[in-house]
Curated annotation (Swiss-Prot):
Gene3D superfamilies: YacF-like, YacF-like domains. It holds the Pfam family ZapD. GO terms for cellular component: cell division site; cytoplasm. Interacts with FtsZ. HAMAP family: ZapD (MF_01092). This is Cell division protein ZapD. It comes from Shigella dysenteriae serotype 1 (strain Sd197). Belongs to the ZapD family. It is found in: Cytoplasm. One of its GO terms (biological process) is division septum assembly. InterPro entries: ZapD (IPR009777), ZapD_C (IPR027462), ZapD_sf (IPR036268). Cell division factor that enhances FtsZ-ring assembly. Directly interacts with FtsZ and promotes bundling of FtsZ protofilaments, with a reduction in FtsZ GTPase activity. Coiled coil: none annotated. It comes from the Bacteria.
Amino acid sequence: MQTQVLFEHPLNEKMRTWLRIEFLIQQLTVNLPIADHAGALHFFRNVSELLDVFERGEVRTELLKELDRQQRKLQTWIGVPGVDQSRIEALIQQLKAAGSVLISAPRIGQFLREDRLIALVRQRLSIPGGCCSFDLPTLHIWLHLPQAQRDSQVETWIASLNPLTQALTMVLDLIRQSAPFRKQTSLNGFYQDNGGDADLLRLNLSLDSQLYPQISGHKSRFAIRFMPLDTENGQVPERLDFELACC
Protein backbone atom coordinates (compact mmCIF):
# COMPACT_ATOMS: atom_id res chain seq x y z
CA MET A 1 0.00 0.00 0.00
CA GLN A 2 1.26 3.48 -0.86
CA THR A 3 2.53 5.24 2.26
CA GLN A 4 3.22 8.69 0.76
CA VAL A 5 0.65 10.97 -0.86
CA LEU A 6 1.78 13.63 -3.33
CA PHE A 7 -0.07 16.96 -3.34
CA GLU A 8 0.55 19.65 -5.96
CA HIS A 9 -0.53 23.28 -5.70
CA PRO A 10 -0.15 25.99 -8.38
CA LEU A 11 1.26 29.35 -7.35
CA ASN A 12 -0.01 31.31 -10.36
CA GLU A 13 -2.89 31.28 -12.81
CA LYS A 14 -1.03 29.77 -15.76
CA MET A 15 0.07 26.77 -13.68
CA ARG A 16 -3.47 26.36 -12.35
CA THR A 17 -4.74 26.22 -15.92
CA TRP A 18 -2.03 23.79 -17.03
CA LEU A 19 -2.71 21.38 -14.16
CA ARG A 20 -6.43 21.42 -14.91
CA ILE A 21 -5.78 20.70 -18.59
CA GLU A 22 -3.38 17.88 -17.71
CA PHE A 23 -5.97 16.36 -15.35
CA LEU A 24 -8.79 16.56 -17.89
CA ILE A 25 -6.69 15.09 -20.72
CA GLN A 26 -5.72 12.19 -18.45
CA GLN A 27 -9.39 11.64 -17.62
CA LEU A 28 -10.25 11.29 -21.32
CA THR A 29 -8.49 7.94 -21.52
CA VAL A 30 -9.45 6.47 -18.13
CA ASN A 31 -12.63 4.69 -19.26
CA LEU A 32 -11.65 3.75 -22.80
CA PRO A 33 -12.93 2.04 -24.80
CA ILE A 34 -16.35 3.66 -24.52
CA ALA A 35 -18.77 0.76 -24.27
CA ASP A 36 -21.78 2.19 -22.44
CA HIS A 37 -23.66 5.34 -21.51
CA ALA A 38 -21.66 5.94 -18.31
CA GLY A 39 -18.35 5.76 -20.15
CA ALA A 40 -19.64 8.06 -22.87
CA LEU A 41 -20.85 10.70 -20.41
CA HIS A 42 -17.53 10.57 -18.54
CA PHE A 43 -15.68 11.19 -21.80
CA PHE A 44 -17.92 13.94 -23.16
CA ARG A 45 -18.10 15.74 -19.82
CA ASN A 46 -14.31 15.94 -19.70
CA VAL A 47 -14.17 17.12 -23.32
CA SER A 48 -16.70 19.83 -22.49
CA GLU A 49 -14.73 20.98 -19.43
CA LEU A 50 -11.53 21.04 -21.49
CA LEU A 51 -13.15 23.30 -24.07
CA ASP A 52 -14.38 25.57 -21.27
CA VAL A 53 -10.82 25.86 -19.94
CA PHE A 54 -9.44 26.59 -23.42
CA GLU A 55 -11.89 29.47 -23.81
CA ARG A 56 -10.75 31.23 -20.63
CA GLY A 57 -7.18 32.07 -21.55
CA GLU A 58 -4.35 32.14 -24.04
CA VAL A 59 -3.22 28.57 -23.48
CA ARG A 60 -1.11 28.32 -26.63
CA THR A 61 0.60 31.69 -26.04
CA GLU A 62 1.54 30.86 -22.44
CA LEU A 63 2.85 27.43 -23.42
CA LEU A 64 4.99 28.85 -26.23
CA LYS A 65 6.48 31.39 -23.81
CA GLU A 66 7.26 28.61 -21.35
CA LEU A 67 8.85 26.43 -24.03
CA ASP A 68 11.15 29.35 -24.89
CA ARG A 69 11.92 29.99 -21.22
CA GLN A 70 12.85 26.36 -20.64
CA GLN A 71 15.16 26.44 -23.68
CA ARG A 72 16.94 29.49 -22.30
CA LYS A 73 17.36 27.80 -18.91
CA LEU A 74 18.85 24.71 -20.54
CA GLN A 75 21.22 26.78 -22.68
CA THR A 76 22.88 28.13 -19.53
CA TRP A 77 24.10 24.56 -18.84
CA ILE A 78 25.84 24.19 -22.20
CA GLY A 79 29.58 23.88 -21.64
CA VAL A 80 29.29 23.42 -17.86
CA PRO A 81 31.71 20.67 -16.73
CA GLY A 82 30.07 17.50 -15.43
CA VAL A 83 26.77 18.13 -17.20
CA ASP A 84 25.50 15.63 -19.78
CA GLN A 85 25.76 17.86 -22.86
CA SER A 86 24.07 15.38 -25.19
CA ARG A 87 21.07 15.26 -22.85
CA ILE A 88 20.89 19.07 -22.73
CA GLU A 89 21.06 19.34 -26.52
CA ALA A 90 18.41 16.64 -26.94
CA LEU A 91 16.02 18.43 -24.55
CA ILE A 92 16.52 21.75 -26.33
CA GLN A 93 15.72 20.13 -29.68
CA GLN A 94 12.63 18.44 -28.21
CA LEU A 95 11.41 21.78 -26.85
CA LYS A 96 11.99 23.45 -30.22
CA ALA A 97 10.12 20.66 -32.02
CA ALA A 98 7.19 20.82 -29.59
CA GLY A 99 7.00 24.60 -30.08
CA SER A 100 7.04 24.30 -33.87
CA VAL A 101 4.23 21.74 -33.83
CA LEU A 102 2.17 23.81 -31.38
CA ILE A 103 2.56 27.11 -33.24
CA SER A 104 1.53 25.56 -36.57
CA ALA A 105 -1.43 23.62 -35.15
CA PRO A 106 -5.02 24.85 -35.60
CA ARG A 107 -6.71 26.71 -32.76
CA ILE A 108 -6.57 24.50 -29.68
CA GLY A 109 -9.80 22.52 -29.33
CA GLN A 110 -11.29 23.79 -32.60
CA PHE A 111 -11.62 20.29 -34.06
CA LEU A 112 -13.60 19.23 -30.98
CA ARG A 113 -15.77 22.37 -30.96
CA GLU A 114 -16.82 21.77 -34.56
CA ASP A 115 -17.80 18.14 -34.04
CA ARG A 116 -21.57 17.79 -34.22
CA LEU A 117 -21.91 14.97 -31.66
CA ILE A 118 -19.71 16.73 -29.11
CA ALA A 119 -21.67 19.96 -29.61
CA LEU A 120 -25.01 18.19 -29.11
CA VAL A 121 -23.87 16.46 -25.91
CA ARG A 122 -22.33 19.68 -24.51
CA GLN A 123 -25.68 21.44 -24.83
CA ARG A 124 -27.35 18.82 -22.63
CA LEU A 125 -24.70 18.25 -19.95
CA SER A 126 -25.84 21.14 -17.75
CA ILE A 127 -29.42 19.80 -17.67
CA PRO A 128 -30.12 17.24 -14.90
CA GLY A 129 -30.71 13.94 -16.68
CA GLY A 130 -30.43 15.81 -19.97
CA CYS A 131 -28.55 13.04 -21.77
CA CYS A 132 -31.35 10.46 -21.79
CA SER A 133 -31.93 8.59 -25.05
CA PHE A 134 -35.05 10.66 -25.84
CA ASP A 135 -33.05 13.89 -25.33
CA LEU A 136 -30.01 12.71 -27.29
CA PRO A 137 -31.02 10.09 -29.85
CA THR A 138 -27.78 10.90 -31.71
CA LEU A 139 -25.72 9.70 -28.74
CA HIS A 140 -28.03 6.71 -28.32
CA ILE A 141 -27.45 5.47 -31.86
CA TRP A 142 -23.71 6.27 -31.62
CA LEU A 143 -23.46 3.93 -28.63
CA HIS A 144 -24.93 1.14 -30.76
CA LEU A 145 -22.37 1.50 -33.55
CA PRO A 146 -19.65 -1.16 -33.84
CA GLN A 147 -17.02 -0.74 -31.12
CA ALA A 148 -14.24 -0.33 -33.69
CA GLN A 149 -16.08 2.58 -35.31
CA ARG A 150 -16.50 4.38 -31.98
CA ASP A 151 -12.88 3.68 -31.03
CA SER A 152 -11.65 5.20 -34.28
CA GLN A 153 -13.67 8.37 -33.74
CA VAL A 154 -12.50 8.73 -30.14
CA GLU A 155 -8.87 8.25 -31.20
CA THR A 156 -9.29 11.02 -33.79
CA TRP A 157 -10.73 13.38 -31.17
CA ILE A 158 -7.90 12.70 -28.72
CA ALA A 159 -5.24 12.92 -31.45
CA SER A 160 -6.43 16.45 -32.27
CA LEU A 161 -5.02 17.47 -28.87
CA ASN A 162 -1.57 15.94 -29.47
CA PRO A 163 0.27 19.25 -30.19
CA LEU A 164 -1.01 20.62 -26.87
CA THR A 165 -0.46 17.39 -24.95
CA GLN A 166 3.13 17.01 -26.16
CA ALA A 167 4.10 20.59 -25.27
CA LEU A 168 2.30 20.56 -21.92
CA THR A 169 3.84 17.24 -20.87
CA MET A 170 7.35 18.49 -21.63
CA VAL A 171 6.83 21.78 -19.79
CA LEU A 172 5.32 20.19 -16.67
CA ASP A 173 7.96 17.45 -16.55
CA LEU A 174 10.77 20.03 -16.63
CA ILE A 175 9.10 22.21 -14.00
CA ARG A 176 8.50 19.24 -11.70
CA GLN A 177 12.12 18.13 -12.04
CA SER A 178 13.50 21.63 -11.44
CA ALA A 179 13.66 21.34 -7.64
CA PRO A 180 14.38 18.46 -5.23
CA PHE A 181 12.19 17.46 -2.31
CA ARG A 182 13.51 18.73 1.02
CA LYS A 183 12.46 17.71 4.50
CA GLN A 184 10.46 20.38 6.34
CA THR A 185 8.65 20.50 9.68
CA SER A 186 5.39 22.23 10.52
CA LEU A 187 4.64 23.57 14.00
CA ASN A 188 1.11 23.13 15.32
CA GLY A 189 -0.07 22.29 11.83
CA PHE A 190 1.29 25.45 10.18
CA TYR A 191 4.19 26.15 7.82
CA GLN A 192 5.10 29.19 5.73
CA ASP A 193 8.02 30.17 3.54
CA ASN A 194 9.13 32.26 0.59
CA GLY A 195 8.30 30.82 -2.81
CA GLY A 196 11.36 32.17 -4.61
CA ASP A 197 9.38 32.81 -7.82
CA ALA A 198 8.23 29.18 -7.93
CA ASP A 199 5.33 28.13 -10.15
CA LEU A 200 4.39 24.94 -8.33
CA LEU A 201 4.52 23.44 -4.85
CA ARG A 202 4.89 19.67 -4.54
CA LEU A 203 4.34 18.14 -1.12
CA ASN A 204 4.85 14.54 0.03
CA LEU A 205 2.89 13.62 3.14
CA SER A 206 2.70 10.34 5.02
CA LEU A 207 -0.64 8.59 4.65
CA ASP A 208 -0.38 7.40 8.26
CA SER A 209 -1.12 10.90 9.55
CA GLN A 210 -4.40 11.11 7.59
CA LEU A 211 -3.83 14.83 7.14
CA TYR A 212 -4.16 17.01 4.07
CA PRO A 213 -2.67 20.45 3.30
CA GLN A 214 -4.62 23.64 2.73
CA ILE A 215 -2.24 25.83 0.72
CA SER A 216 -2.56 29.53 0.02
CA GLY A 217 -0.22 32.10 -1.44
CA HIS A 218 1.62 33.01 -4.62
CA LYS A 219 5.07 32.67 -6.17
CA SER A 220 6.81 34.91 -3.63
CA ARG A 221 5.24 33.62 -0.40
CA PHE A 222 2.98 30.75 0.64
CA ALA A 223 1.45 29.18 3.72
CA ILE A 224 0.42 25.60 4.45
CA ARG A 225 -2.06 24.53 7.11
CA PHE A 226 -2.45 20.82 7.77
CA MET A 227 -5.98 19.61 8.44
CA PRO A 228 -7.22 16.22 9.73
CA LEU A 229 -9.31 14.13 7.36
CA ASP A 230 -11.51 13.22 10.35
CA THR A 231 -12.70 16.69 11.33
CA GLU A 232 -14.29 15.48 14.59
CA ASN A 233 -11.69 13.13 16.05
CA GLY A 234 -8.54 13.72 14.01
CA GLN A 235 -5.56 15.49 15.55
CA VAL A 236 -2.67 17.47 14.11
CA PRO A 237 0.68 16.72 15.80
CA GLU A 238 2.67 19.57 17.30
CA ARG A 239 5.52 18.78 14.91
CA LEU A 240 4.90 17.19 11.52
CA ASP A 241 7.63 16.19 9.07
CA PHE A 242 6.92 16.34 5.36
CA GLU A 243 8.77 16.78 2.07
CA LEU A 244 8.42 19.93 -0.02
CA ALA A 245 9.66 20.98 -3.45
CA CYS A 246 9.28 24.56 -4.72
CA CYS A 247 9.42 24.17 -8.50
